[in-house]
């Protein structure tokens, strides 16, 4: 196993414990990121469906708005200059909210009316009813455009976040976790090899001690046997071998 396939650590019990904790953390992180990716993908598909639905509705509304504008111009004439002269500020304004999906912040755009309606009484003039209808249809189109912009912004944001999250999930699953597992295997093999070497060394030491003990016991037995043989082989002196006895007088 090359050093590139595993983490470069010194094989020890402490390193084994640390790698096990690291593996557990990586597996937990992988699980959390996987759940996050699933939640984001689900919301992504929901937004995609809403975008398709809104675009379809937008096409119908714009078609209706175009016909309404044509009808209003046919009856009331060209009122573009009058509208431009009476505009002082935007009546439809936009504010932004934030939506949180699995830790990802998505902007949400909403429209609201600011001030009174300048053309509230337009319906009383010539062709005013058609102009009011045209205004309502185009107002609906603006609201749909804002909603579509909000959905597409969320769509792009989620698409980028999902790609990043999936890359992280794949990196943890196919690179980090296998690398930690190979490191654990390497440490376990090294520790087992050390234990076998230590067991063999202790076994040899015990065998050597047994041999030395047996040799000492044998030497002790031989020494004791020699001492016994010396005692049994020592000559017994008789009265004839004692040359210094005093003469006896009768």
Curated annotation (Swiss-Prot):
Entry-linked PANTHER family: V-TYPE ATP SYNTHASE SUBUNIT D (PTHR11671)
Stated role: Subunit of the V1 complex of vacuolar(H+)-ATPase (V-ATPase), a multisubunit enzyme composed of a peripheral complex (V1) that hydrolyzes ATP and a membrane integral complex (V0) that translocates protons. V-ATPase is responsible for acidifying and maintaining the pH of intracellular compartments and in some cell types, is targeted to the plasma membrane, where it is responsible for acidifying the extracellular environment.
Gene: VATPD
Subunit-level organization: V-ATPase is a heteromultimeric enzyme made up of two complexes: the ATP-hydrolytic V1 complex and the proton translocation V0 complex. The V1 complex consists of three catalytic AB heterodimers that form a heterohexamer, three peripheral stalks each consisting of EG heterodimers, one central rotor including subunits D and F, and the regulatory subunits C and H. The proton translocation complex V0 consists of the proton transport subunit a, a ring of proteolipid subunits c9c'', rotary subunit d, subunits e and f, and two accessory subunits ATP6AP1/Ac45 and ATP6AP2/PRR.
Protein family per UniProt: Belongs to the V-ATPase D subunit family.
InterPro entries: V_ATPase_D
Gene Ontology molecular function terms on file: proton-transporting ATPase activity, rotational mechanism
Signal peptide (from-to): none
Protein name: V-type proton ATPase subunit D
A Pfam family assignment: ATP-synt_D
UniProt keywords, alphabetically: Hydrogen ion transport, Ion transport, Transport
